[in-house]
């Protein structure tokens, strides 16, 4: 047994926010109360710390199979635990892509060896070809939790419609990366800074919000659920809000980098601040924060995208791959740029990182209650820390290295076992 003493116990799902002890027995939380006496249980003193549900990230890239020089499922799991995450959903843009039952089973077999809960989507189209839809029914039966061609937008609207209809038939949903290549220039650079500082045509706002507009209206027509991944533009928030008010079943996520920073970070951090979609303008940053506050955006997801240092450190920054490692800074970015900045309460932040993403997929996760799963994070919500490149991830491609952030994970507990502690 494990007894967590004297913490601030916060459960966004029930609204619980109180000083209490938490008793864990096996894989379950068995009691939440004051002054629990559990005899010979292992004790964690959580005085001055927050005790919350283990975090849930529905958008990570663990690069296995085929790109394990960047990350693998084991190091990805270590990074997740260090960031306070007990449940993650891997994307399918591996090599080969997770487009068939055999590859999916291989990935899930590897994932099952780890000490956190690792799920996976499968691709919408075979090998990301954008034309031939995968076997949704068979892949779901084999363990896929959903479908996404994340990394590559689906340009064929007819395929999007068919995929939505198929997803609806199978009681699931598709998640979409929205950047129309026909309207975009060089990816990873917002159009403003691309023109001004790099003298290139960059990633445009219209490439994002026009594609979102198309897909949310297809969702409205099909009455299927569509999830919009890592939106970054003010107009995108408005389009999603419009569709939701119209009655379309549309959900959306934002990555921490997009509510924390703007395009200027490219000038100081170079390729480590290059990502798809790119960091945008301050007006966009404020708009996605407003979207989180209003509920239009219901999920914070990292888009954890590790790359090898040699790939990022190329002479021509436009040739560097896009993406940043994100699992180990996500909670701190939320605490720093949303809670400390006065935009959200701690409970509101945690809801976006626990129960909301979990409920999207119907996981038994993201809540802290008696008889519930013993998946917890214990953290100091006001402690300052300097981000270093000493990550559990294989990669250190974070533009936040060197920055002082608020919040520090002290323990992560999954299935009743301590999987990370400082």
UniProtKB/Swiss-Prot annotation:
Pfam families per the UniProt record, alphabetical: Amidohydro_1
Coiled-coil zones: none
Catalysed reaction, written as an equation: (S)-dihydroorotate + H2O = N-carbamoyl-L-aspartate + H(+)
Catalytic site: 303
CDD domains per the UniProt record, alphabetical: DHOase_IIa
Top-level division of the source organism's lineage: Bacteria
Record's keyword terms, sorted: Hydrolase, Metal-binding, Pyrimidine biosynthesis, Zinc
GO cellular component, one term: cytoplasm
GO molecular function, one term: allantoinase activity
SUPFAM superfamilies for the chain: Composite domain of metallo-dependent hydrolases (SSF51338), Metallo-dependent hydrolases (SSF51556)
Keyword Transmembrane: no
Phosphoprotein recorded as keyword: no
Binding note for cofactor: Binds 2 Zn(2+) ions per subunit.
Positions contributing to Zn(2+) 1 binding: 59, 61, 150, 303
Pathway: Pyrimidine metabolism; UMP biosynthesis via de novo pathway; (S)-dihydroorotate from bicarbonate: step 3/3
UniProt: Zn(2+) 2 binding residues: 150, 177, 230
Residues at which substrate binds: 61-63, 93, 276, 307
EC number: 3.5.2.3
Similarity annotation: Belongs to the metallo-dependent hydrolases superfamily. DHOase family. Class I DHOase subfamily.
Record's function text: Catalyzes the reversible cyclization of carbamoyl aspartate to dihydroorotate.
NCBIfam families on file: PRK09357.1-4, pyrC_multi
Protein name: Dihydroorotase
Organism phylogeny: Bacteria, Bacillati, Bacillota, Bacilli, Lactobacillales
């Amino acid at each position: 047994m494990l007894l967590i003493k004297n913490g601030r116990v916060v459960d966004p799902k029930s609204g619980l926010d109180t000083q209490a002890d938490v008793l864990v027995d096996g894989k379950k939380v068995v009691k939440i109360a004051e002054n629990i006496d559990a005899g010979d249980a292992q004790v964690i003193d959580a005085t001055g710390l927050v005790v919350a549900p283990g975090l849930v990230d529905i958008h990570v890239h663990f690069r296995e199979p085929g790109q394990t020089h960047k990350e693998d499922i084991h190091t990805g799991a270590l990074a997740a635990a260090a960031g306070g995450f007990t449940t993650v959903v891997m994307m399918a843009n591996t090599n080969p892509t997770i487009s068939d039952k055999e590859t999916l089973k291989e990935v899930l077999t590897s994932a099952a060896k780890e000490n956190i809960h690792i799920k996976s989507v499968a691709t919408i189209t075979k090998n990301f070809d954008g034309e031939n839809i995968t076997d949704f029914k068979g892949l779901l039966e084999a363990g896929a939790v959903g479908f996404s061609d994340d990394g590559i937008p689906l340009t064929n609207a007819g395929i999007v419609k068919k995929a939505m209809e198929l997803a609806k038939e199978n009681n699931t949903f598709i998640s979409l990366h929205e950047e129309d290549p026909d309207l975009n220039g060089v990816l990873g650079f917002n159009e403003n800074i691309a023109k001004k500082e790099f003298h290139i045509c960059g990633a445009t706002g219209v490439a994002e919000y026009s594609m979102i507009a198309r897909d949310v209206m297809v969702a409205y027509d099909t009455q299927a659920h569509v999830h919009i991944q890592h939106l970054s533009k003010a107009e995108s928030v408005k389009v999603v809000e419009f569709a939701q008010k119209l009655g379309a079943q549309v959900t959306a996520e934002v990555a921490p980098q997009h509510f924390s920073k703007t395009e200027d970070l490219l000038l100081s951090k170079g390729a480590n601040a290059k990502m798809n979609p790119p960091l945008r303008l301050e007006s966009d940053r404020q708009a996605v924060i407003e979207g989180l506050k209003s509920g239009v955006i219901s999920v914070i997801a990292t888009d954890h995208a590790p790359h090898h240092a040699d790939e990022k450190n190329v002479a021509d920054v436009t040739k560097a791959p896009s993406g940043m490692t994100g699992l180990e800074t996500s909670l701190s970015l939320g605490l720093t740029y949303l809670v400390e900045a006065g935009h959200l309460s701690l409970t509101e932040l945690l809801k976006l990182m626990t129960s909301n993403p979990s409920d999207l997929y119907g996981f038994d996760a993201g809540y802290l209650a008696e008889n519930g799963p013993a998946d917890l994070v214990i953290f100091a919500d006001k402690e300052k820390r300097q981000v270093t490149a000493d990550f559990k991830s294989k990669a250190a491609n974070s533009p936040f290295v060197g920055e002082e952030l608020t919040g520090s994970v002290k323990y992560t507990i999954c299935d009743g076992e301590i999987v990370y502690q400082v």
